[in-house]
Each structure stands twice: as C-alpha cells, then as structure tokens.
C-alpha cells in the first residue's frame, strides 16, 4: 500500500500548464477565496518541476524506508500477549463459551464479538480487559468464541450461527442461572445480537450494543463502488474457496483508511521498543493479524446483502423467515457509539439505536478498537457499561 501510494503521487504529477485538469479547480478556489483571478502561469513558473519531483522522490523514499524499519521492528519484537486463558464453561454446537468468573449469583452477561476478528480483543491486556472488568464489577460474564468457520458446515450461514450457537448459548445460561442474560455485542456481534432480541426476547434481559453497524450506506460510497465493481471476482473467490480468506477480509477494511498502515508503522519505528507503548502495539498488531476467514454464505450476506444492498436498514435481513426489525426489541438497550470510529461510522451505529424504542445512547470520543483496548477504555466504556447493566439487573 505504501509503494502504491508513492506511485500514485508520481502518476498524479500534472503538466505545468493552465489547461491542466488540476489547475482549473485551483484557479477557481483561489478566485472564490480572494475575489481575484489566478494567473496559471504565475504560480507554476515559481515551481521548478525537476526540483519538485526530486523532493517528492526523497520524501517518498524516506517514508518507505521508515515504514520498512517499523515493520521489521514489529516482526522481530520478542514481546507477546501473555494473558491467562479463561475456563471453557461449555459449548454451543462445538463453539466454546468462555467463563470469566464472577459470583455464581451475579447477573449473567453473554458477550458476542465480531465474526471477522478473534474474540480476545475483549481480553487483550490485564488492565484493559472488558471481560475481566465486568467480572470485577460483580457480574458473571461469558464470551462466545466464534473461532473459525471450520466449526460449522461449509454451507453455514448467519441463520446457523444464530440458531445453532447464539440462541443455544442464551438457553444454557438461563437454564444454569435461572434468569436471562444481558446480551452484549461488539461490532458485527452487536448486529447479530438483534436477532435473538427479536426472535427470543425471553432469553434477553437487556441489550448492549458496542459500535454496532446497521445502516451500511451511511458512509462514503467508496467501499460500495469497489464491491460493486469487484463482485464477480469476489464471488468467484468465495465459491472456489468456500470462504472469504483472511487476506481478502483484511484488504477490505484496510481500504477504509488506506494510509493507516503506513502511519502506524512509521510511528512504531520512532518508539522506544522497550516501552509499554511499544509492547501494547505489538500485542494489538498481533491480534489484528490473527484474523479468521468468513464462511462463504456469511461473507455473501455481509459483503453483498449488508454493505452493498443495505438489507438491514431496508428490512430485508431475515433469520429463517423472520425479518429482524429493531423496532420490535422491547428490552432495555444501551448503545455505546465511538465518535472517532472509522470502521463503523457513528451514523451507522446511531441508526440502530434510534430504531429501538427507549434506547440509551452514550457517545465516547474513542475509535473502534480504542473503545475496547485503549488507555481510556476502562473509564469511558467498561465502567459505564457495567454500571448500566447492574442498574438494569436490580430493577
């Protein structure tokens, strides 16, 4: 991506003439701002094209070099995540449900992560663990670990994940604790939690949505245009492999912010590699690179029905024969929406919250991953969510 960006800079150099496609908008902008027309020759003559190209080349090479240094430093870093593994409480159709402790009489909480990345982002660091924070507040949290598509039949779709894993997990919790669980969903996991909240309200005491998308057309059209143009290739890949491979899924999300990879590794290159910040960077980057493929039918639903056709907001997303309508959710609902999220834009998450009657919306000045693993996550997300759950459970 860094190399491609550099090449695009060179390719974007325009002829030094008033007739350049780029110079016309510049002229218009200057005239609108100053009220005076810009003489195209006067400004272009002040720039030596050779010097400009040389300066651009040096800057590009410096950025690439620093980027490469950062990548190498990350790959060679000896630090790795060393968190103790939680107990496996039970399984839902072979999917593990992880037990994070807490009192047996506490309010049970089932946390549902996204299908795209592994669940341990919710338990990444000792002092930045959403799951352990819930337990520390006297709740009894469980984590549904989706692992990877090999745990289901290759033809498994979202109906299978919800009807054969998510709902049975909620049934198990109610059977053991004699009370329904508070259901918490992060990212795509939050979107999925709306299904049992509609289909089996008897199993859901309350609902917490963390950066959960619903209106997939609330962002720019770039991703949708790319999906539309690439659909034939994507469908062929999914049909051939039976899944959307990790590299494909990661490429889609990198495309949401193409310069992020370069920026973060150049920043890492400047860090003290023995610092706490550097070690946290390594752990987080390891998690990001530890992705899982999407089962073929799930990939088609997410990419084409959700992102391309906006099936959720249009009332076209079904589990079985039932349309999932957030308007039918009657349980207490909290939506935590990070205002700096570039993966699930706030407008997308807000659309879901606004469809649920009486929902509470909490905005936090954090990013998509920062709300779970950032230095301010404990104060701004963990504690308020735990307090809200405790308050709901006591009523």
Language model regions located:
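Alpha/beta-hydrolase-fold enzymes
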Residues: 1-49, 175, 192-297
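Short, surface-exposed "cap/lid" segments of acyl-processing enzymes
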Residues: 74-77, 82-150
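Short beta-strand/loop motif that positions the catalytic acidic residue
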Residues: 329, 335-337, 341
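Short alpha-helix in the alpha/beta-hydrolase fold that links the catalytic acid
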Residues: 331, 345-354
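Catalytic histidine-centered segment of alpha/beta-hydrolase-like enzymes
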Residues: 343-346, 366-380
């Amino acid at each position: 991506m860094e190399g491609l960006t550099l090449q695009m800079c060179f390719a974007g150099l325009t002829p030094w003439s008033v007739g350049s496609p780029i110079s016309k908008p510049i002229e218009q902008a200057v005239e609108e701002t100053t009220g005076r027309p810009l003489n195209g020759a006067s400004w272009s003559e002040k720039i030596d094209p050779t010097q400009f190209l040389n300066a651009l080349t040096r800057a590009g090479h410096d950025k690439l070099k620093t980027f490469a240094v950062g990548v190498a430093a990350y790959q060679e870093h000896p630090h790795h995540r060393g968190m103790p593994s939680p107990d496996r409480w039970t399984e839902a159709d072979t999917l593990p449900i992880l037990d994070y402790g807490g009192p047996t009489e506490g309010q049970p909480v089932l946390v549902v992560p996204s299908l795209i990345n592994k669940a341990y982002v919710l338990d990444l660091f000792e002092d930045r663990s959403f799951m352990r924070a819930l337990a520390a507040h006297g709740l009894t949290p469980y984590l549904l670990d989706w692992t990877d598509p090999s745990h289901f039949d290759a033809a498994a779709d979202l109906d299978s994940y919800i009807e054969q894993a998510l709902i049975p997990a909620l049934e198990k919790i109610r059977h053991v604790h004699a009370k329904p669980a508070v259901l918490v969903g992060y990212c795509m996991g939050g979107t999925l939690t709306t299904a049992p909240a509609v289909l089996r309200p008897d199993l859901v005491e309350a609902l917490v949505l963390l950066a959960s998308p619903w209106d997939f057309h609330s962002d720019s059209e770039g991703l949708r245009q790319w999906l539309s143009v690439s659909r034939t290739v994507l469908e062929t890949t999914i049909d051939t492999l039976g899944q959307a491979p990790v590299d494909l899924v990661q490429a889609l999300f990198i495309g949401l912010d193409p310069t992020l990879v370069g920026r973060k590794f150049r920043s890492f290159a400047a860090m003290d590699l023995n610092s706490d910040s550097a070690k946290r960077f390594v752990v987080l980057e390891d998690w990001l690179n530890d992705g899982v493929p999407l089962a073929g039918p799930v990939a088609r639903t997410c990419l084409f029905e959700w992102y391309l056709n906006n099936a959720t907001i249009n009332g076209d997303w079904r589990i079985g024969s039932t349309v999932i309508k957030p308007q039918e959710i009657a349980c207490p609902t909290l939506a935590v929406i990070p205002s700096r999220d570039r993966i699930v834009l706030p407008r997308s998450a807000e659309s879901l919250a606004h469809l649920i009657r009486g929902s509470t919306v909490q905005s936090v000045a954090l990013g998509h991953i920062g709300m779970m693993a950032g230095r301010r996550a404990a104060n701004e997300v963990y504690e308020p969510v735990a307090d809200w759950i405790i308050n709901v459970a006591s009523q």
